[in-house]
């Protein structure tokens, strides 16, 4: 209610993308900590609501104070304006240097190594976009020592059968 036709049309893609990546492909668990980059984006706002309702502690990044406020209203526990603060340092501080279990990244570029730094042992980095670059240099030794999983996906390449499976899972 209150959405334009165009706005309503994009909802399934955001929900399907989040559900598939968090719960079907990566089996995210309650009480984990998640960092969602681009918290005020379509993917970000959807991810905040789903993960908060699922019982995760939610960190987000944005590029303005107003967007951070919006993310908090949607359920984010912590919203970081990256124009004013180094998200890596703040998340480390808020988690007492433990880091987070899962990161949803639509930014890419120089965020990727920072994400690797922030992930706990056996953490999962899910790449859903590359606003600042798709080609990156990372420390593979850190990936190996922390036993990290780096993954990503797009619905566009999925078959109709895969999308039907996601829809059925979401309906439950």
Question: How would you describe each model-predicted region?
Answer:
Residues 18, 51, 71, 101-103, ...:
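Terminal peptide-recognition signature
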Residues 31, 76, 99-100, 143:
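Local beta-strand N-terminus motif with an aromatic residue
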Residues 86-97:
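Short amphipathic alpha-helix with an adjacent loop that forms part of the alpha/beta core around
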